[in-house]
Amino acid sequence: MPSARSGPATLELVAGPSRAVLDPARGGRVASWAVGGEQLLVGPPDDTDSSIHWGCFVMAPWPGRLANGRFEWGGRTVQLRRTHGRHAIHGLTWNRTWAVDSVAAAAASLSIELPRDEWPMGGRVRQRVRLSASSLVLEATIEADEAMPAALGWHPWFLRRGNPRLRVDAATYEVTEAMVPTGAAAAVGGSADLRAGPRIGRRRLDLAYLEARSPAVVTWPDLELRIAFEPAPVPLVVYTPPGSFCVEPLTATPNALALASRERRLAGVRELGAGERLGAKVILSVAPASGRA
């Protein structure tokens, strides 16, 4: 239920040993999730208004980097605000305030209007978060007011305690130039091959895996996390900075909006008509580790 702290209200969800806190004012993100007192997500830094590197948030109406913050749509060029060097990153909802539509003991629904001064087509994004004793279910939907391209994803920041293992069942990833995906694919190999569930260790990855099969699996010394996604298979970004790591299920590859129309659709972008919707779901479920960690 709503709880107070310095600054805007947060929402606390509780289901048995599982506890999650949502922060509507900071991107509608899951600010924390703990099971049996064990925290899974990176917590907020002191400057939570400007930091992207914590919690778990929805990326919409596009995920990941968009080269030069620009794409073509309906015969016009849409120029977005550049938020990551020369590029626009992670959509328009991660750093804005979401409205709280409903909240119960273990579930909440939030929504946000896409700002027309940055996204001329308008529209809105809705998300529902449901908690159980051993799972966190995340659902999101983009609704179009008029014809528009759409994609979404989630960006969880996981704690890296105990040198966890990560299994991603994908045989290819998207080639990048200057950290921006190009649309070309390469076979996984070396440190990029996560199919056997290796330890993250010193791997420094920032890759969009293609057609990843559900679920991805994280194994800490005492806990296993299964990241299931619907629909599947999907593009799945793995990012491994020092001290944390991210496993990001997406409905389209990063930079897909910048591709030509046919390639854009092949990369997963949905072209919505007025009143149409794009939805997706992620189910994070935990269980005791089997001993392999």
What is the role of each PLM region?
Residues 1-5, 76, 81-133:
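Extended, loop-rich substrate-binding clefts of extracytoplasmic carbohydrate-active enzymes
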Residues 13, 20, 24, 112-160:
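Acidic, contiguous internal or C-terminal segments within carbohydrate-active enzymes
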Residues 19-77, 245-246:
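Acidic-aromatic substrate-binding/catalytic surfaces of carbohydrate-active enzymes
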Residues 71-79, 140, 270-287:
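Short Pro-Gly-centered flexible turn/kink motifs
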Residues 149, 157-231:
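Active-site/ligand-binding surface loops and adjacent short beta/alpha elements
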Residues 220-255:
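Glycine-rich active-site loops that engage anionic ligands at enzyme catalytic sites
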Residues 247-269:
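A conserved acidic, glycine/proline-rich C-terminal tail/linker
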